[in-house]
Curated annotation (Swiss-Prot):
InterPro entries: Ac_CoA_lig, ACAS_N, AMP-bd_C, AMP-bd_C_sf, AMP-binding_CS, AMP-dep_synth/lig_dom, ANL_N_sf. GO terms for biological process: acetyl-CoA biosynthetic process; acetyl-CoA biosynthetic process from acetate. It is an enzyme of class 6 (ligase). This is Acetyl-coenzyme A synthetase 2. Gene3D superfamilies: 3.30.300.30, N-terminal domain of ligase-like. Keywords: ATP-binding, Ligase, Nucleotide-binding. One of its GO terms (molecular function) is acetate-CoA ligase activity. The gene is ACS2. CoA binds at R207, G208, G209, R210, T326, S540, R603. It catalyses: acetate + ATP + CoA = acetyl-CoA + AMP + diphosphate. Its EC number is 6.2.1.1. SUPFAM superfamilies: Acetyl-CoA synthetase-like (SSF56801). GO terms for cellular component: cytosol.
Length: 671
């Protein structure tokens, strides 16, 4: 039986009305949907769980091109940590993303590149992309890069980043992309951990109207990177003050001019690594997550096609960077595997104004838009006046990624961006999952604002009691979200540390993959992601989800964002401390009155036991580059350990920390 607390959480979810897909969505579909209705989805899902060989085998042959057919669809277990898919098969990721489309339709747009300054924007066709990828691959091959090697990529979100990744994959090597915003120290750590033989970068980056000396950061990092032998430098700004290190650094344009526009791709085994990607530092030391080639490619293609309802005529705009998994899977691999154009955006949603996203959608008639709630909150704060200037009628599917989208942001997204005419896909997944785990299929699964809905094909989701470790059967329940069997795009290991992989994902609940997140499953079987399991506070025996308390706080129209942490309390075990940032125009609000109002809001929404001990009003919350709130920072400050914050240089807004320390000190009488 669920506890009263669990029942209350799920009861709140059950009260949300189902939203059917608007008729305009179907009117805008260029072809019939891939799945007719939710019943067909459920039938396909059941087959994917009960007969994964019979389900995924034919799909792998349909969506991917093979140099040598596979003989075994699925092998290994979660418990043993030896998952493998499509054994015996051979293929190449670059061929699947580029060549086959270039041969069939060379003039079709592949990369629609929107630069920070719109005047620098351009389009690469599939034919162009094949030539550019082959030339860069030729350079790398001449440097001795081969199957089994790893090459680092430290580039902004531009065409060259995509070309570099595909060129590395063309040779059967693995790419390790580092977000072009990390410090020299972070670059060094990632390059050394992956033993990268080469690095691909640029002179400078342009983002939000600002210029960043990318090459300088790389030079600082490479002082302590003994494995890097060569560096390829793209001239983004052509700044004459950027200098090369003789014998190590070479300019992109000079070197690629030496090689022909076609280089045959290298076949690799299905389980050979395609890439490494380091998880963000919000959970401690970054882990180099390793994704295999065939399984990852199938996951990317399958989820892009079915969850977003992608057709050959569509144009996907994923507002995510290739420095993160969203950019890998849904800006690069997913759309290119399906042969559709992908919009690559170098800039920010606020430059030159808050209408930039919508200007891009209108200009290219994008059919799909995929973005993080962090950006949506920023745009909502700026107001709707920038949205109404643009024609967004080409849009059919709106996606959300990176964190659960709160019902109020969902409603705003639906009304002002989608005009109540689009399907919204609130997607739940992870760097480690490679592709979507839980999401409502566009045009198929009705929505519940705030819920990620049903698991995707092959994802046998389960809720685990965190105390007993036993699976919770049935609906109307809450627990730790786990997965009962492996799926094609699941990460295979942590680079050079399989023990860490097992301890992190497989050993907490043997026989299950541990997501690290809590979730509720309502009476319809819809999943509601409740945030990280470690983002739970225990007040007087009540286990409270911080995400639930945060949702209650942002119901107040004055609050833009909220983050909740637990601190030690002699009486209750833990106490709730809430940090809130206000919307523009509310900074002069009576802070004491607002604090009391917010405490009352939580008491009313959840119960007296969940009421924050203190509400601290701040200018901004500390975030990672991918937009996730760093609650670790807030916990340290709240525990009077501000002198033990560690490295905060990888935050997107490190200046926020000083304001948080000051606000906490002012309220608790400490400096």
């Amino acid at each position: 039986m669920p506890t009263e607390q669990t029942h209350n959480v799920v009861h709140e979810a059950n009260g949300v009305k189902l939203r059917e897909t608007p008729k305009e969505f179907f009117e805008r579909q260029p072809n019939k949907g891939h799945i007719h209705d939710v019943n067909q989805y459920k039938q396909m899902y059941e087959q994917s769980i009960k007969d994964p060989q019979g389900f995924f085998g034919p799909l792998a042959k349909e969506l991917l091109s093979w140099d040598h057919d596979f003989h075994t669809v699925k092998s290994g277990t979660l418990k043993n940590g030896d998952a493998a898919w499509f054994l015996g098969g051979e293929l190449n990721a670059s061929y699947n993303c580029v060549d086959r489309h270039a041969f069939a339709n060379p003039d079709k747009p592949a990369l629609i590149c929107e630069a920070d300054d719109e005047k620098d924007s351009h389009i690469l066709t599939y034919g162009d992309l094949l030539r550019e990828v082959s030339k860069v691959a030729g350079v790398l091959q001449s440097w001795g890069i081969k199957k089994g090697d790893t090459v680092a990529v430290y580039l902004p979100m531009n065409a060259q980043a995509i070309i570099a990744m595909l060129a590395i994959a063309r040779l059967g090597a693995a790419h390790s992309v580092i977000f072009a915003g990390f410090s020299a120290g972070s670059i060094k750590d990632r390059v050394n951990d992956a033993s990268c033989k080469a690095l691909i970068t640029c002179d400078e980056g342009k983002r939000g109207g600002r210029t960043t000396n990318i090459k300088k950061l790389c030079d600082e990092a490479l002082v302590d990177c003994p494995t890097v032998e060569k560096v390829l430098v793209y001239k983004r700004t052509n700044n004459p003050e950027i200098h090369l290190t003789e014998g190590r650094d070479y300019y992109w344009d000079v070197e690629t001019a030496k090689f022909p526009g076609y280089l045959p791709p290298v076949s690799v085994n299905s389980e050979d690594p395609l890439f490494l990607l380091y998880t963000s530092g919000s959970t401690g030391t970054p882990k180099g997550v390793v994704h295999s080639t065939a399984g990852y490619l199938l996951g990317a293609a399958l989820s892009t096609k079915y969850i977003f309802d992608i057709h050959p005529e569509d144009i996907l705009f994923t507002a995510g960077d290739v420095g993160w998994i969203t950019g890998h899977t849904y800006a690069l691999y997913g759309p290119l595997l399906l042969g559709v154009p992908t919009i690559i955006f170098e800039g920010t949603p606020a430059y030159p104004d808050y209408g930039r996203f919508w200007q891009i959608v209108e200009k290219h008639k994008a059919t799909h838009f995929y973005v993080a709630p962090t950006a949506l909150r920023l745009l909502r704060k700026a107001g709707e006046q920038e949205i109404v200037k643009y024609d967004l009628s080409s849009l059919r599917t709106l996606g959300s990624v990176g964190e659960p989208i709160s019902p109020d942001i969902w409603e705003w997204y639906n009304e002002f961006v989608g005009k109540n005419q689009c399907h919204i896909s609130d997607t739940y997944w992870q760097t480690e999952s490679g592709s979507h785990l839980i999401a409502p299929l566009a045009g198929v699964v009705p929505n519940k604002p705030g819920s990620a809905s049903y698991p995707f094909f092959g994802i046998d989701a389960a809720l685990i009691d965190p105390v007993t470790g036993v699976e919770i059967e049935g609906n109307d329940a809450e627990g730790v979200l786990a997965i009962k069997d492996h799926w094609p795009s699941m990460a295979r290991t942590v680079y050079k540390n399989h023990t860490k992989y097992m301890d992190t994902y497989m050993n907490p609940y043997p026989g299950y993959y541990f997501t690290g997140d809590g979730a509720a499953r309502d009476h319809d079987g819809y999943y509601w992601i409740r945030g990280r399991v470690d983002d739970v506070v225990n007040v007087s025996g009540h286990r409270l989800s911080t995400a639930e308390i945060e949702a209650a706080l942002i119901e107040d129209k004055k609050v833009s964002e909220a983050a909740v942490v637990g601190i030690h309390d002699d009486i209750t075990g833990q106490a709730v401390i809430a940090y809130v940032a206000l919307k523009e125009g509310n900074s002069d609000e009576d802070s004491e009155g607002l604090r009391k109002e917010l405490v009352l809001q939580v008491r009313k929404t959840i119960g007296p036991f969940a009421a924050p001990k203190s509400v601290i009003i701040v200018q901004d919350l500390p975030k990672t580059r991918s937009g996730k709130i760093m609650r670790r920072i807030l916990r340290k400050v709240s525990s009077n350990e501000a002198d033990q914050l560690g490295d905060i240089s990888t935050l997107s807004n490190p200046q926020s920390v000083e304001g948080i320390i000051s606000a906490f000190g002012a309220q608790f009488g400490k400096k």
